[in-house]
Amino acid sequence: FQPGCNCLIGKDFRRWHGACDGSVVGSDKESGMARTFYDEMYDASGNCRPHYREFARWLAETPEELLAQRRREADLLFHRAGITFTLYGDEQGTERLIPFDTIPRAIPMSEWRVVERGCIQRVKALNLFLADLYHEQRIIKAGIIPAEQVLANEGYQIAMQGLDLHRDIYAHIAGVDLVRDGDGTYYVLEDNLRTPSGVSYMLEDRKMMMRLFPELFAAQRVAPIDHYPNLLLETLKSSSPLDNPSVVVLTPGRFNSAYFEHAFLAREMGVELVEGADLFVRDDRVFMRTTSGPQPVDVIYRRLDDAFLDPLAFNPESMLGVPGLLAAYRSGNVVLANAIGTGVADDKSVYPYVGDMIRFYLDEEPILRNVPTWQCRKPEELSHVLAHLPELVVKETQGSGGYGMLVGPAATAAEIEAFRERLKARPDAYIAQPTLCLSTCPTFVEKGIAPRHIDLRPFVLSGRETRLVPGGLTRVALREGSLVVNSSQGGGTKDTWIVED
């Protein structure tokens, strides 16, 4: 251990993690959340957790130079494969390689089963909420969610009112962001129901680990995830009432931040990747332009925001969408996955009500907890937030990617005061939460191995049934002390292992 660098050199990381795991960093009596860091690999006594023992043994026996060589090889292979994302506003170039860490995040199967059941329960309730919101609005009439909270929401689409969808599914693909608090409890940080991204990195990270370290997978049973594209295609086909519907992936184009993923998923599913200009609508039917003439399209896996889907119905300046698409959709001649208007359910101002949705629609208690949340639109909660800004994380209700937020403990006094004025000017645009003690996982950094904060995004598919592959995208905040894991903010990824207990 080198003083001052907060990292480890060589194999001495076990002793360091044992000493640091569970160190108290404060308390939060109001939220009831633990204020310690949970280390995924080591317990508070410094002992390796059982599901990591095989990996820890391998890591201790593997020469450091070989590990470094494999990490360099991973970077080279990711570059060659074009596994990048686009960083908007970057003056030095738009395409970036997402840093990949070769120490996996491992989860025992018994623990995963709870996460799986909780994600399925949550997405089922969210789909029921969307079906209810765009029809009878029973949850509003019951006084559980205020009407203005959803009907005046930017994500609510009046064009969806009264429209019946096959199987009543709105969010066919959902990403549920999970974090683990200091006592090991999983919390849902947010739901992603519009165009959730990141699954391609989950799949490519696994391919990379199997290529670089096949001996690890021979020594330990890790649940497979490579069947995800097949499950996704089954889900998309089941969203249509037709026996064998034609499916396409609609992308905004190669300058979109997730274009690699759009192309990757289309290729893996064996379907066409199209842009808006490749499609047209005739007699309320969608067709794809091909060299063999127009071909009908039945299901569109759209990776395009609502506002850009149809210039005749939404943003008239959109050059990315398909004129007449909404009319075809409302006529029942094409399926959009995800449905238009799903954004109202993953809005951060609606997030506090998801537990109530589970109780209302499923008559069950939530398996996964929400993070305690203050709604700044409520005067009494705004007063609390303004009085405790240095301690809280404040987010825009429509924000994403780690932008437009304040992390109080990491902000300067000037930044806090500037944010205070923004908050007072538009309180309804913000929510606040306690600063989470995200769990840590050993991670390769420049000078060795050090703990870095992580989250987890499992991907939930809703078709004939609701299901997940055993895994997800683990994102890691690579900067020391950072709690922001988003790739747009310098975060990286890890392979996620679901292992036998």
Regions found by a protein language model. Name each.
Residues 5, 12, 18-21, 25-501:
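Preference for protein termini
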